[in-house]
Amino acid sequence: MALSQNQAKFSKGFVVMIWVLFIACAITSTEASLTKCQQLQASANSGLIGAYVPQCKETGEFEEKQCWGSTGYCWCVDEDGKEILGTKIRGSPDCSRRKAALTLCQMMQAIIVNVPGWCGPPSCKADGSFDEVQCCASNGECYCVDKKGKELEGTRQQGRPTCERHLSECEEARIKAHSNSLRVEMFVPECFEDGSYNPVQCWPSTGYCWCVDEGGVKVPGSDVRFKRPTC
């Protein structure tokens, strides 16, 4: 028995609806099988050229280190792919230490925001220390800093300056002690090769040794005589 015109239209529409539902279910099933990282990766790959594309492991989880190739920046992420504050640098951060305590540079990087007229967050090395050269994105000025991130006077200029290693506080104190014209034996601080204070300081003429902090300040109660304390 031949189908009426209305029946034929209904039958055709029903078939189309079934196909639409089938395709929708297939797409939903495919998306459901993808991890969050893979979904974001697929979405980014279909977007603008040069956009950030998440890097995923073979298992679908986020790689601990994420990089944005067009900018040269890399950073560490948690299991949900969220950036761990203070880890973004130009180059390759050490994300095996991502749960370790942040360095001063990383903490400043995490809390300082880009404000017009300000230099913005500092640039940190892979080990978390300050880059010798810091630059202001707002005006293109760059300058040299010490190990604590403090600007070295006379180094600010347009473009990147050549930042030779300057004398540290410990090295300056050591030179000053050696140049003293008095014959009395002065205390001469002990410095490491990188210019930082040796945590154990001694005054040979008195026989005393003591512990100091990173700034060379004596730790109260650490004085001992005729031996080196454990600092």
UniProtKB/Swiss-Prot annotation:
Residues 34-95, 102-163, 167-231 form the Thyroglobulin type-1 domain. Pfam families: Thyroglobulin_1. GO terms for cellular component: extracellular space. PROSITE patterns: THYROGLOBULIN_1_1, THYROGLOBULIN_1_2. The keyword Transferase does not apply. It comes from the Eukaryota. CDD domains: TY. Its main location: secreted. The keyword Cytoplasm does not apply. It is found in: Secreted. Residues 1-32 form the signal peptide. Disulfide bonds join 37-56, 67-74, 76-95, 105-124, 135-142, 144-163, 170-191, 202-209, 211-231. Keywords: Disulfide bond, Protease inhibitor, Repeat, Secreted, Signal, Thiol protease inhibitor. InterPro entries: Dev_reg/Prot_inhib, Thyroglobulin_1, Thyroglobulin_1_sf. One of its GO terms (molecular function) is cysteine-type endopeptidase inhibitor activity. Belongs to the protease inhibitor I31 family. Potent inhibitor of papain-like cysteine proteinases (Ki=0.18-0.57 nM on papain), as well as of the aspartic proteinase cathepsin D (Ki=0.3-05 nM). This is Equistatin.
